């Protein structure tokens, strides 16, 4: 009897020293996500927050962003860049180029097609039982008087993502709302950029910090 208890105790002790399986989180997006893996990027900031809360043993963070990507591009590389890696969580942060490129190069994505491809991505992810976090695109221009050229489309595409999140009962990181609220409080000179972005789109240090804070709140609650 004593021998059995000894061996049971030994086994339990050995199990306690085995490394815990980490939750693999993939951030799937465009150049903003690609830059997120840089030292000052939002993905690295999330990793730092995770460590500060003594949760580094629980999560592994992976960036899968490619500059210029739109929702169609994400759909095309979903299998290789996300599903093949067997993540526990995927954070989808897309939409800026779908709107921005309508004006800059005429290669944006119409709203109906945006919703179709976004939903197709979610269908494939859901089939793999991967937890999914949706994010609205933040800004194309930071003016607070609603005079940014593409404010209307940014609101429209953000509403599409909000509706998809609600329909599928998925967690939402509403970066559009968070950025607008931050700019309304701090951008008193109605600047087009320089508050949360370097150029009206790509994040500066404060923008990366805000994105990290908003995403981390949701990720750690899953």
Kindly give the residue locations of the regions a language model identified.
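Serine-esterase "nucleophile elbow" of acetyl-processing enzymes
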Residues: 15-67, 72, 77-86
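Sec-dependent N-terminal signal peptides
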Residues: 5-14
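Surface-exposed cleft-lining segments at the edges of enzyme active sites
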Residues: 99-112, 145-149
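Charged, glycine-enriched surface loops/patches
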Residues: 109-135, 160-164, 168-170
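Catalytic His-Asp segment of secreted/periplasmic serine-dependent ester chemistry enzymes
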Residues: 38, 138-222
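Proline-aspartate-enriched helix->loop->beta-strand connector
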Residues: 83-92, 96
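Solvent-exposed loop/turn segments at secondary-structure junctions
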Residues: 31-35, 66-71, 96-101, 138-142, ...
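Active-site segments of SGNH/GDSL-like serine hydrolases
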Residues: 93-97, 122-156
